[in-house]
């Protein structure tokens, strides 16, 4: 099991870029897709979330990121290299989660961290809709980078 050192940065870089792009896609395109705005009799604008569209949008976004990463970005990597690289990103996510949970009033100045947690966070949102909110969802969603592992090659060519 030899891991090429130049491949260790690929999954963390891809996850951070994909999370940032997912954040902006959700904010700008998602608003037009799953937010329903109506004007009631009194002339007030009410905004509601269409939950079916929300689930479809987030599921599609998660799968697009997963498939683009697995089929394009990590094509030349072995399964072991992807697992090690994804493990690095998972450890970073779990450290940040530990800091967030240990500080009762997590500083709002560090809100920028949320942008880089968007892609794995989609998984926890979808699981929370099915199972209900639970603290374990915060931990399991950060294992999402490990889902790239089956897309790797069995050995280096």
Task: Tell me the role of every PLM-derived stretch.
Residues 1-58:
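Transmembrane alpha-helical insertion/packing segments
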Residues 38-42, 107-128:
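Membrane-interfacial helical/loop segments at transmembrane boundaries in membrane proteins
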Residues 14-27, 84-106:
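Hydrophobic alpha-helical membrane-insertion segments
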Residues 50-79:
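Canonical alpha-helical transmembrane segments
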Residues 64-74, 92-99, 144-148, 152:
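Membrane-cytosol interface at the C-terminal ends of transmembrane alpha helices
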Residues 2-7, 70-84, 154-157:
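Membrane-interface helix-boundary motifs at transmembrane edges
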